[in-house]
UniProtKB/Swiss-Prot annotation:
ATP binds at residues 463-471, 483. CDD domains: C1_B-Raf, RBD_BRAF, STKc_Raf. This is Serine/threonine-protein kinase B-raf. Binds 2 Zn(2+) ions per subunit. It is found in: Nucleus; Cytoplasm; Cell membrane. The modification Phosphothreonine is found at residue 753. It is an enzyme of class 2 (transferase). Pfam families: C1_1 (PF00130), PK_Tyr_Ser-Thr (PF07714), RBD (PF02196). Zn(2+) 2 binds at residues 248, 251, 269, 272. GO terms for cellular component: cytoplasm; cytosol; mitochondrion; nucleus; plasma membrane. The active site is at 576 (proton acceptor).
Length: 766
């Protein structure tokens, strides 16, 4: 540390006293200071000296970064020097700010700031060998008292925005250009990522980074320009009355009469017109532009995409930055152009390396819905936030107790057995008949009644295997699907959690959900559902490549959204929604299946339950891949998976088909660098469906819509599509199915009209 400080001090002394003599203040800076306070002429000189000290300190920090920045584990002496220089830089910047404010106020500042000046001077002399006189106070209090106080002049930066607009932002220390201009750009429908910022130097525009400190640009003029290959258009608003369920894109409230842009589809109330973005931005092409630029400047090496063979005992994952961050994580640095890259490879846990990316599990007809215990009020709160007023009865009694709190909790088990039915029966008469009927109802409502004894199910051929079990075709009062779960010798806690989740599954009844018929615990845990004769949506789209019409594809999406809306209304999170788990009957009726319970999908340690990565990576939301939260699965994670299903429907192919590396997909999607390419959708795909797909695939979880709003949008789209009706002039006999030979049996000559004059030529006239 001493050697490093002495070397830095020698370099600083040579910069100030040797080869690089500090230049006098520039005329612009001196004129600005002279006109601001009119005080002692030594003040601008001191400010100039402090600026030179700041510049010198930054050069030392940059030298340290160039020397040790590329090392994963830099020496401790480097970290100590780094902290010392950054703290010194903060002190110098604070002193500069005090001088500028004092010059603007025209008040006495030498006494109040002498302590800070001495501190800066002493710290500078200890490490940089700079004379304390360079930071000494030259101001005479009596001279300042003779000047009349003037209003302070705040440091500002003038900014010229696109479309001949301009604004002024304050030049605050420690605030980046991005943060200073973010609000002004958002009000104009722009984001920093689609623009470039320039500064004017010597009559030429020179680009600067968005992370540059705005205080370094005090008094300058910045120009913000839209990137060349970012498509921007103006809105095309029309007044519209929405006779079907619609929501304002700004306030998310119900919309009946308002306006709609014919280009981008933005709809809003008249009172929300002031908040509408001024430009139409094609965010789909914008995402593609960012991804292409990222691959150009940030190639992914093999080391970054390598999966770890083992996982930590805690089940946690390495930290991954949020999806809206760009670039690898870096140490904070005061220099905008230097950073310390610290590569952190993303290593998901418990991956089976034997399964290659190209090998996919066969579809099974067993449902795979995770019962994630969410309070009934949460779905209402989320729907209210999205502007949807949900209706329906309370779901009390349908929510299971959180699996993590189940073991050893007798009160939780009792609370689960409470339901509105038995409570009403207890209020009835105490006669023996009522009591017997109450017992009958209670027996029928208990989860034990859904347990199928061992030996009643005849297990047939093996259909396929999934991530957490194997599916067989069986016989139990008809054809059923039996999914044997991969749980051997379950503990009492696991068994109780499994029964609690079954208590919720047994109450699911919907036309678009596979019917749950029962479960068994011997010889192993298994769930029994109805048998589906049709094939999965994955089989139709990617195996036999069935060519569906657009109206059929939209109807499949509508039924899927309808089934998911029902599950979410029951506080059930699917967790593994994908085209393999969506089944189509011969009449194209959608059935959502593949229930994989939380008891099976979670990792148990003793009596405690931990979440683990489950499902197929192509349908996983970024927050699920990162696994930073204790329970990343939510209604919005199902919405993201539904967005991938929409992508399959509208393109006929899987996302990221151009990337063959499974680990690279996990890495890129988890960090928010990769999104499905929406430019591959079919040419006849409606714009509303494409917008809905983009909203469902938002990288930020809270920005995705919920299924009530999704279902309303798809139903509106389905009703708006043109339909070809049967011609009214078609012969009714052909519609009845008669053939040509049916008429030949009754063939007869058709009468002809007489054509002779008068019409009576064939008859004698008397």
């Amino acid at each position: 540390m001493a050697a490093l400080s002495s070397g830095s001090s020698a370099e600083g002394a040579s910069l100030f006293n040797g080869d690089m003599e500090p230049e006098p203040p520039p005329p612009v800076l001196g004129a600005c200071y002279a006109g601001s306070g009119g005080g002692d002429p030594a003040i601008p000189e001191e400010v100039w000296n402090i600026k030179q000290m700041i510049k010198l300190t930054q050069e030392h920090i940059e030298a340290l970064l160039d020397k040790f920045g590329g090392e994963h584990n830099p020496p401790s002496i480097y970290l100590e020097a780094y902290e010392e220089y950054t703290s010194k830089l903060d002190a110098l910047q604070q002193r500069e700010q005090q001088l500028l404010e004092s010059m603007g106020n025209g008040t006495d500042f030498s006494v109040s700031s002498s302590a800070s000046t001495d501190t800066v001077a002493s710290s500078s002399s200890s490490s940089l060998s700079v004379a304390p006189s360079s930071l000494s106070v030259y101001q005479n209090p009596t001279d300042m008292s003779r000047n009349n106080p003037k209003s302070p002049q705040k440091p500002i930066v003038r900014v010229f925005l696109p479309n001949k607009q301009r604004t002024v932002v304050p030049a605050r220390c420690g605030v980046t250009v991005r943060d200073s201009l973010k609000k002004a750009l958002m009000m104009r429908g722009l984001i920093p990522e689609c623009c470039a910022v320039y500064r004017i130097q010597d009559g030429e525009k020179k680009p600067i980074g968005w992370d540059t400190d705005i205080s370094w640009l005090t008094g300058e003029e910045l120009h913000v320009e839209v990137l060349e290959n970012v498509p921007l258009t103006t809105h095309n608003f029309v007044r519209k009355t929405f006779f079907t369920l619609a929501f304002c894109d700004f306030c998310r409230k119900l919309l009946f009469q308002g306006f709609r842009c014919q280009t981008c589809g933005y709809k809003f109330h008249q009172r929300c017109s002031t908040e509408v973005p001024l430009m139409c931005v094609n965010y789909d092409q914008l995402d593609l532009l960012f991804v292409s630029k990222f691959f150009e400047h940030h190639p992914i090496s093999q080391e970054e995409t390598t999966l770890g063979e083992t996982t930590p005992a805690s089940g946690s994952y390495p930290s991954v930055p949020p999806s809206d961050s760009v670039g690898p994580p870096i140490l904070p640095s005061p220099s905008p152009s230097k950073s310390i890259p610290i590569p952190q490879p993303f290593r998901p846990a418990d991956e089976d390396h034997r399964n290659q990316f190209g090998q996919r599990d066969r579809s099974s007809s067993a449902p795979n819905v995770h019962i994630n215990t969410i309070e009934p009020v949460n779905i209402d709160d989320l729907i209210r936030d999205q502007g949807v007023r949900g209706e329906g009865g309370s779901t009390a009694g349908l929510s299971a107790t959180p699996p993590a709190s189940l073991p050893g909790s007798l009160t939780n088990v009792k609370a689960l057995q409470k339901s509105p039915g038995p409570q009403r029966e207890r209020k009835s008469s105490s006669s023996s008949e009522d009591r017997n009927r109450m017992k009958t109802l209670g027996r029928r409502d208990s989860s034990d009644d859904w347990e199928i004894p061992d030996g009643q199910i005849t297990v047939g051929q093996r259909i396929g295997s999934g991530s957490f079990g194997t599916v067989y075709k069986g016989k139990w009062h008809g054809d059923v699907a039996v999914k044997m779960l991969n749980v051997t010798a379950p503990t009492p806690q696991q068994l109780q959690a499994f029964k609690n989740e079954v208590g919720v599954l047994r109450k699911t009844r919907h036309v678009n959900i596979l019917l749950f018929m029962g479960y068994s615990t011997k010889p192993q845990l298994a769930i029994v559902t109805q048998w589906c004769e049709g094939s999965s949506l994955y089989h139709h789209l990617h195996i036999i490549e069935t060519k569906f019409e657009m109206i059929k594809l939209i109807d499949i999406a509508r039924q899927t959204a309808q089934g998911m809306d029902y599950l979410h209304a029951k506080s059930i999170i699917h967790r593994d929604l994908k085209s393999n788990n969506i089944f189509l009957h011969e009449d194209l009726t959608v059935k959502i299946g593949d229930f994989g319970l939380a008891t099976v999908k979670s990792r148990w340690s003793g009596s405690h339950q931990f979440e683990q990565l489950s499902g197929s990576i192509l349908w996983m939301a970024p927050e699920v891949i990162r696994m930073q939260d204790k329970n990343p699965y939510s209604f919005q994670s199902d919405v993201y998976a539904f967005g991938i299903v929409l992508y399959e429907l509208m393109t006929g192919q899987l996302p990221y088909s151009n990337i063959n590396n499974r680990d690279q997909i996990i890495f890129m999607v988890g960090r928010g660098y990769l999104s499905p390419d929406l430019s591959k959708v079919r040419s006849n795909c409606p714009k509303a469906m494409k917008r809905l797909m983009a909203e469902c695939l938002k990288k930020k979880r809270d920005e995705r819509p919920l299924f009530p709003q999704i279902l309303a949008s798809i139903e509106l789209l389905a009703r708006s599509l043109p339909k070809i009706h049967r011609s009214a002039s078609e012969p009714s006999l052909n519609r009845a199915g008669f053939q040509t030979e049916d008429f030949s049996l009754y063939a007869c000559a058709s009468p002809k009209t007489p054509i002779q004059a008068g019409g009576y030529g064939g008859f004698p006239v008397h």
